[in-house]
């Protein structure tokens, strides 16, 4: 049994109010009730999909992965322990704070806290309503989106996520960042989303390279792009990726890493073959400011 989808992300930020404005008025997320001093945001019928908590890191603090049942959660726990990972069965108080029925946690080889849970809270009685008019984000069985981690040991990270958590390799990109620098990105899936996680070995003062949210309407990408252009917050222009075929742009967050806002990613189907690429984009994704 593997994890089945990305359920939520937690980010430690130095300016919660700046994130509140960015998430709602630039990304189009809906603010949700949250513990005092923090902020949470919705993308769909779930109670929340990402949260920001105060602190100096301006970086990823936790990634929450979902499974479908208590039995599935126990199978993942057994798998991780057999792999040699210390797993903590979290308290009912933390589960209630997260809005889930059951919760375990562990730490990946790069030091990222992972929470694995079942029984997330649905809020159909309070329909999702984007403050910027985003029609719909693509979530459901594909989870909330994806994120990319900069890690010190790629082999250790890949082994953990594939052997420990049950991810599968989608493909690899050898990215020539500059004439002097080339990095290899590994893209991993745990459901039909082309990648829920990617890992890259590169010098970085942050774990989080970027996170991605996907809409079901191309116009929502263009409208978000216009909003970010107004703030001079575009890092990479509109473009289309070689591997997942997503049309997207990258914008700067108040914490310094990027958010990819996209549409149109292809789906991993049975019989998927792993391939490699020499470029990250078919067209576009030109640098507008330092990444």
Swiss-Prot record:
Q: What Gene Ontology terms describe what this protein does at the molecular function level?
A: biphenyl-2,3-diol 1,2-dioxygenase activity; ferrous iron binding
Domain VOC residue range list: 5-119, 143-264
Its EC number(s): 1.13.11.39
- Cofactor(s) needed: Fe(2+)
The record lists the catalysed reaction(s) as: biphenyl-2,3-diol + O2 = 2-hydroxy-6-oxo-6-phenylhexa-2,4-dienoate + H(+)
Q: Which GO terms describe its biological process?
A: xenobiotic catabolic process
> Where does this protein hold Fe cation?
146, 210, 260
| Metabolic or biological pathway | Xenobiotic degradation; biphenyl degradation; 2-hydroxy-2,4-pentadienoate and benzoate from biphenyl: step 3/4
Which key words tag this protein in UniProt? Aromatic hydrocarbons catabolism, Dioxygenase, Iron, Metal-binding, Oxidoreductase, Repeat
Query: Which principal EC class is assigned to this enzyme?
Result: oxidoreductase
Family membership, please give it: Belongs to the extradiol ring-cleavage dioxygenase family.
Instruction: Fetch the NCBIfam families from UniProt.
Output: 23dbph12diox
State the name under which the record lists this protein.
Biphenyl-2,3-diol 1,2-dioxygenase 1
Coding gene? bphC1
